[in-house]
């Protein structure tokens, strides 16, 4: 079980809302830093370990700087993510660039920054050489095909995913890259998403460590690092058990000692890209109740919508909800909690048991620190909300203002009206 406790009180929420109107995404600096330190401690046995935070999860430079201060790098997948990371001071081996169907501009920018470039396809070897150049160190993304099983259950279906290369293609890519001047190599793979088990990373590590030994033997390539990518999830639901990062790190260490060390590859660095695990629990969407509707069901309408948090509408994903100030009240009312989009799937919760809710109540939607604001959009003319940092000293800082109508119309060149 995972107890879902907001990291702010109703009084704090009202204090922030007096300065920055709801809805807004709020991030907990203290929680972010403490979690980053736990991750680094869990993998401290590996001298080359580095967490590359997935920028796509939460692309905000203020948050990237916090993670940078805690020793993290960044995982980028687009030109603009590279630009944001560069602006934050990330360079060279602090950047992992993993992309697919990659434009030449993106590849060249990653090369110019000295990033570790992770190639998604065999044809990208020639593409890299043509449009950027072949660096000393290159990574290739592996897809084992088939299904990825853990215990008695299938975790995911890599064979149906568009990402990565087969083992034969990996070997061919390494051979071609060595001929073009590459000297060191990385292996990267992502086989399952949001796993809530301590066994996923160790199982994946075993697969990739054995692959590394085979590729080293078959091609002579020096394997510099193995990137376990993301996939370590969080307990969105209270009835789920949270992952134990210390146990996960220890499980990976055992596989490392069992497979790589006997093969003379004990100097291989371990990388991770845990966007969700690093930030999701340390972010929340704070929103105010605007309306109640009593028809065939009971509806609670809030000032946020799916444009602020897409996951429930897009995936049917569960996000826990707390009514601030009513944490100890009985959850004896059944509601659909809805936003104002002209779409019936704009619902943060369906048939959710909550305390009795009144207009003006402040609703705290948990675990939006990753894939929350970043997946926002402007459908229905909705404007993206502000982002706020709750600092370690209890003060708050606006780290992204809310969009305005001027922002929404900024790309039009049609009428002076839009410049108002």
Give names to the regions the model predicted.
Residues 73-75, 96, 118, 139-141, ...:
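Structured core elements
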Residues 32, 56, 78, 110, ...:
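Conserved, mostly hydrophobic/aromatic
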Residues 260, 265-420:
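Charged (often Lys/Glu-rich) extended helix/loop segments that serve as interaction or gating elements
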Residues 1-117, 122-136, 177-179, 183, ...:
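A charged N-terminal "starter" segment
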Residues 59-62, 103, 126, 147-148, ...:
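Flexible loop/turn segments at secondary-structure boundaries
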Residues 144-290:
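Active-site loop/helix belt of alpha/beta enzymes
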Residues 64, 86-87, 107-111, 128-131, ...:
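Short acidic, glycine/serine/threonine-rich loops at helix termini
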Residues 133-147:
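Glycine-rich, aromatic-flanked loop segments that form ligand/cofactor-binding clefts
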């Amino acid at each position: 079980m995972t107890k879902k406790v907001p990291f702010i009180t109703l009084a704090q929420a009202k204090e922030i809302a007096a300065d920055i109107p709801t809805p807004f995404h709020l991030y907990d600096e203290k929680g972010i830093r403490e979690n980053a330190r736990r991750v680094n401690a869990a993998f401290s046995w590996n001298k080359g370990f580095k967490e590359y935070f997935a920028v796509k999860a939460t692309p905000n430079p203020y948050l990237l700087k916090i993670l940078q201060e805690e020793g993290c790098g960044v995982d980028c997948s687009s030109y603009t993510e590279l630009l944001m990371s560069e602006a934050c001071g990330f360079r060279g081996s602090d950047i992992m660039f993993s992309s697919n169907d990659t434009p030449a501009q993106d590849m060249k920018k990653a090369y110019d920054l000295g990033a570790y470039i992770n190639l998604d396809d065999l044809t990208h070897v020639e593409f890299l050489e043509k449009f950027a150049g072949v660096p000393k160190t290159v990574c290739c993304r592996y897809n084992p095909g088939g299904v990825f099983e853990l215990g008695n259950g299938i975790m995911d279906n890599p064979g149906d995913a568009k990402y990565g290369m087969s083992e034969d293609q990996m070997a061919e890519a390494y051979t071609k890259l060595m001929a073009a001047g590459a000297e060191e190599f990385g292996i990267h793979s992502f086989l399952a998403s949001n796993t809530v088990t301590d066994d996923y990373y160790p199982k994946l590590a075993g697969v990739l460590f054995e692959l590394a030994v085979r590729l080293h033997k078959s091609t002579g390539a020096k394997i510099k690092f193995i990137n376990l990518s993301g996939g370590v999830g969080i307990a969105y639901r209270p009835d789920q058990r949270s992952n134990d990062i210390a146990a996960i790190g220890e499980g990976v260490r055992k596989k490392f000692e069992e497979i790589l060390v006997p093969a003379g590859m004990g100097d291989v660095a371990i990388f991770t890209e845990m966007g969700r695990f690093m930030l999701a629990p340390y972010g929340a969407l704070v929103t105010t109740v605007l309306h109640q509707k009593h028809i065939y069901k009971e509806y609670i309408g809030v000032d946020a919508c799916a444009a602020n948090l897409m996951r429930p509408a897009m995936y049917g994903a569960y996000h826990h909800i707390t009514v601030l100030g009513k944490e100890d009240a009985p959850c004896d009312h059944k509601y659909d909690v809805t936003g104002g989009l002209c779409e019936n799937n704009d619902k943060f919760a369906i048939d959710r048991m909550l305390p009795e809710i009144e207009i003006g109540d402040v609703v705290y939607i948990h675990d939006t620190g990753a894939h929350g604001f970043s997946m926002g959009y402007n459908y229905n003319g909705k404007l993206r909300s502000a982002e706020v940092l709750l600092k370690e000293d209890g003060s708050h800082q606006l780290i992204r203002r809310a969009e305005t109508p001027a922002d929404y119309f900024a790309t039009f060149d049609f009428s002076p009206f839009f410049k108002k």
